[in-house]
């Protein structure tokens, strides 16, 4: 089958899986993971589903907390669209196609690309990238109107877009406008681990629209220790599906190693109320697993900076 046919089949399967899990509980989820582990052919896929089997052995893990929140608070079409576009399009089909190109040409490739929200070039760059197998974008809207993403996202329904935004810009009207996009993950950006009133309001507006969102927190040497404290995790669990941690420039290597170790170990511990993602470590891990040529993509204008590190 061609990509469109395979994607359509995958989308149908995703909707069926969500329905089965809602009706049959997490036993059905484990059944699906076991089936995928059996069918997986490539080592990267086998490793992923083996980890998923391990993670789902305990029903009090943060993975179950995430799945509960997704099923309870996010529209099914959003779950399936983001999952298929990012998971199948980005990390299975797309990554495989990109790896073939890289192995042949020996040139850097990227499954995820950073850009400035509102950049007029994206109307051509996004579909062109999809034609090569790159479907995932991370857009910076921290100093512009986040609603500018809507036309781009609607015009490229097979791509997935992460949208970094200042919580104060995510007004009720803005969030209602963003809700028209099924292939969007909104990422309110907090400059410190402090859960600000603006951050809480933004999260609750997104939740009210049954949207896919992830509070994203910048940390440094002084604040890294806060993100593994139980009271901080509990407060984040009240407001977000999961939490993305990203290191500010200048954060020491020692702090980075400790944070990475704490986040990874915490994912399999019992009783953790919220899943923590590690922007720097997780994307780098995925890149290394896919190909030695995989890197962070960027089409930022010359001289521009980005809120998250790209390397």
Regions from the language model: what does each represent?
Residues 125-129, 152-153, 177-178, 203-206, ...:
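Generic structural signal for hydrophobic
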Residues 1-46, 50-53, 259-311:
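Accessory C-terminal segments flanking Radical SAM cores
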Residues 117, 136, 183, 197-288, ...:
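Conserved C-terminal portion of the radical SAM core fold
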Residues 148-166, 263-275:
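Alpha-helix-loop-beta-strand connector modules within alpha/beta enzyme cores
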Residues 147-158, 178, 203, 229-233, ...:
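Short low-complexity, flexible loop/linker segments enriched in glycine and/or proline
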Residues 42-115:
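N-terminal [4Fe-4S]-dependent radical SAM core
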């Amino acid at each position: 089958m061609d990509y469109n046919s395979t994607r359509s089949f995958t989308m149908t399967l995703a909707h069926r899986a969500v329905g089965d899990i809602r009706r049959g509980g997490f036993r059905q989820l484990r059944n699906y993971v076991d089936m995928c582990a059996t069918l997986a052919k490539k080592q990267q896929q086998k490793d992923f589903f083996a980890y998923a089997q391990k993670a789902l052995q305990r029903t009090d893990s943060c993975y179950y907390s995430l799945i509960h929140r997704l099923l309870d608070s996010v529209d099914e079409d959003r779950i399936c669209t983001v999952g298929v576009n990012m998971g199948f399009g980005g990390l299975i089909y797309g990554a495989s196609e990109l790896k073939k190109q890289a192995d042949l040409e020996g040139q850097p490739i990227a499954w995820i690309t950073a850009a400035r929200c509102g950049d007029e070039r994206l109307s051509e760059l996004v579909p062109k990238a999809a034609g090569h197998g790159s479907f995932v974008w991370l857009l910076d809207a921290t100093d512009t109107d986040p609603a500018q993403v809507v036309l781009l996202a609607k015009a490229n329904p097979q791509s997935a877009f992460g949208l970094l935004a200042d919580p104060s810009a995510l007004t009720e009207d803005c969030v209602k406008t963003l809700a028209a996009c099924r292939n969007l993950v909104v990422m309110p950006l907090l400059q410190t681990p402090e859960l600000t009133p603006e951050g809480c309001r933004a999260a609750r507006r997104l939740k009210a629209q049954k949207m896919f969102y992830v509070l994203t927190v910048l940390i440094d040497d002084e604040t890294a220790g806060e993100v593994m404290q139980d009271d901080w995790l509990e407060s984040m669990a009240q407001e977000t599906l999961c939490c993305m941690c990203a290191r500010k420039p200048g954060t020491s290597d020692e702090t980075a190693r400790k944070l990475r170790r704490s986040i990874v170990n915490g994912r399999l511990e019992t009783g953790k109320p919220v899943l923590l993602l590690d922007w720097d470590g997780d994307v780098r891990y995925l890149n290394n697993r896919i190909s030695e040529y995989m890197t962070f993509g960027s089409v930022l204008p010359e001289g521009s900076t980005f809120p998250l590190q790209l390397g």
